[in-house]
């Protein structure tokens, strides 16, 4: 637990700011301009025509001096809790409704005054006029949120219960201008034209968290998708009071929790965006490989895989131990999975890509990269390729060729190892069953952009297993520490959750009672993770911070136990 003052100890001391101009000056709370009919009509016109969905931005919401005093009370008297899930990383206060005690009102006089003003009948009526929304309830639902360096909130639509209007009042330091380079912008996502109630992979509007401004937008299922961009600034924090105005009456449709339900129950609306920014709906993201092969892992298979894999994992007794561990723990992590000869080639390609600036790319870098979405579930790049054929007898010489860039090398490993009958036999021995194996994919997670969120698996009669072979630049001591600290994300998180039908929001998988069921695998070069899946298991790749040493590249595949 920490206070805002402790969380932002690097920021400058606030000076007394200039008040609103005399015509708008109030007795220390909200700008009287907000209550004028002409202003409300103007803002309503802006609201109705705004894109990508209805929203408005208000400036000079409060008297500057008053807001500075409220901020000082936040810094001094309000306790913040650090919260991190697959969806966010933030310092958050309790609901500010809890300040309704004698001590709370005494210590936070201006803060409670601000809260009361925001939920007053007068201001709620003003919000109704500006947005055209139904009558709003007096229910207080707000908190203080502080996003320090690396803080973020990924794409979601805010739809829970009777929420009608979302608002954010910014209290970020007014003594140093907030710029685009600082990050922390509110990102608004348009809805895909291809897939109903699904956000496009990229936002089309970004709003900076400027001092004494307020954003309001209508909460709409499958429409109001937004995110808080990662805060890139090292010595600034994005500070806000945010919350919701609720409708007075409860409708059956109001309980729908669109983006959260997609995370919990999964969805088929996966999308990809090509380099031409054309979205493509994927009816089925998995292609099963032909599995007609002898299930016995034999000498020829071992000889073949020794050219690629660490020999320590090809011993029969070692494979038996892996099988027992997977059966007991549900997860195994194999470091130094590729042999040193192959790993050296990949390592050099990663260094080369960093040196020539292609280490962290986007879909415009190559016609072969596509962005996978939708962003309220996932965002990363997938490398599209046709299966390659070996052109040289010595595959090490071929992989080392200058014409082979990093994605080409990873593609070759995917094709020649993951798609080989020898590897499928090895997998069958480790898992202990005949398998159907999906075609592997090469992915790239870019710093400051990419992630997958926790999606609960649907119930299945067949046992399923996921494979993930990870590569990152952790070659220097500082790089290794950065990844292992977890501060820059990129790790694979593996969790046992509540029973399928009882889990209602993404954050529920992180309740304190489930903390002991959470495990993570650091983003580490040349590490294979195999996970046994079921309907009570969720996995995700944590959002990768812009300050990460490199992209995270991986090769993934899935296997299903045959009947």
Question: Each predicted region: which residue ranges?
Answer:
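PAPS-dependent sulfotransferase catalytic core
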Residues: 7-17, 24-30, 35, 46-51, ...
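Proline-centered turn/helix-capping motifs that create local helix->coil transitions or kinks
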Residues: 26-27, 78-80, 135, 175-180
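Non-heme Fe(II)/2-oxoglutarate
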Residues: 35-130, 309-311, 319-426
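C-terminal structural cap/anchor segments
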Residues: 408, 412-432, 438-455
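Short, surface-exposed acidic
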Residues: 132-141, 432-442
């Amino acid at each position: 637990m920490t206070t805002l003052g402790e969380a932002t100890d690097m920021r400058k001391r606030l000076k007394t700011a200039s008040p609103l101009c005399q015509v708008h000056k109030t007795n220390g709370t909200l700008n009287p301009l907000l209550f004028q009919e002409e202003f409300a009509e103007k803002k309503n016109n802006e609201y109705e025509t705004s894109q990508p969905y209805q929203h408005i931005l208000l400036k000079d919401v409060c008297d500057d001096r008053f807001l500075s005093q409220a901020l000082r009370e936040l810094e001094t008297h309000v306790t913040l809790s650090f919260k991190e899930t697959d969806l966010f990383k933030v310092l958050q206060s309790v609901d500010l409704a809890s300040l309704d005690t004698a001590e709370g009102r005494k210590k936070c006089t201006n803060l409670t005054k601000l809260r009361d003003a925001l939920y007053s009948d007068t201001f709620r009526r003003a919000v109704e006029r500006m947005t055209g929304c139904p009558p709003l309830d007096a229910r207080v639902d707000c908190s203080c949120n502080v996003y320090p360096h690396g803080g973020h909130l990924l794409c979601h639509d805010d739809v829970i219960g009777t929420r009608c209007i979302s608002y954010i009042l910014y209290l970020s330091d007014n003594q140093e201008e907030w710029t685009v380079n600082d990050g922390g912008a509110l990102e608004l996502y348009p809805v895909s034209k291809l897939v109903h109630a699904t956000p496009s992979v990229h936002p089309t509007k970004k709003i900076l968290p400027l001092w004494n401004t307020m954003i309001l937008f209508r909460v709409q299922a499958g429409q109001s998708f937004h995110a808080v961009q990662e805060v890139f600034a090292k010595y600034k924090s994005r500070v806000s009071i945010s919350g919701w105005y609720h409708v007075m009456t409860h409708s059956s449709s109001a309980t729908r929790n669109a983006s959260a339900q997609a995370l919990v129950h999964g969805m088929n609306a996966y999308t990809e965006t090509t380099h031409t920014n054309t979205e493509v709906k994927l009816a089925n993201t998995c292609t099963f490989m032909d599995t007609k092969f002898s299930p016995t892992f034999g000498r020829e298979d071992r000889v073949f895989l020794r050219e690629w894999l660490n020999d320590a994992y090809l011993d029969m007794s070692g494979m038996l131990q892996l099988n027992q561990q997977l059966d007991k723990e549900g997860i195994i992590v194999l470091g130094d999975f590729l042999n040193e000869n192959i790993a050296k080639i990949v390592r050099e390609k990663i260094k080369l890509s960093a040196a020539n600036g292609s280490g962290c790319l986007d879909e415009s870098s190559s016609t072969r990269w596509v962005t996978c979405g939708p962003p309220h579930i996932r965002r990363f790049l997938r490398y599209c390729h046709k299966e390659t054929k070996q052109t040289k007898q010595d595959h090490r010489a071929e992989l080392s060729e200058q014409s082979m860039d990093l994605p080409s090398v990873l593609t070759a490993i995917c094709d020649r190892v993951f798609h080989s009958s020898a590897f499928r036999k090895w997998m069958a021995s480790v898992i202990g069953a005949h398998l159907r194996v999906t075609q592997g994919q090469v992915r790239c997670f870019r710093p400051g952009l990419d992630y997958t969120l926790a999606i609960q698996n649907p119930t299945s009669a067949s046992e399923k297993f996921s494979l993930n072979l990870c590569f990152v630049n952790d070659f220097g001591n500082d790089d290794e520490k950065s990844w292992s600290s977890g501060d820059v994300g990129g790790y694979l998180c593996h969790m046992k959750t509540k029973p399928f039908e009882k889990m209602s929001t993404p954050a529920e998988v992180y309740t304190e009672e489930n903390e002991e069921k959470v495990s993570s695998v650091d983003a580490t070069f040349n590490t294979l993770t195999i996970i046994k899946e079921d309907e009570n298991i969720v996995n995700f790749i944590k959002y990768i911070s812009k300050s990460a040493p490199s992209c995270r590249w991986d090769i993934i595949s899935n296997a299903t136990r045959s009947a």
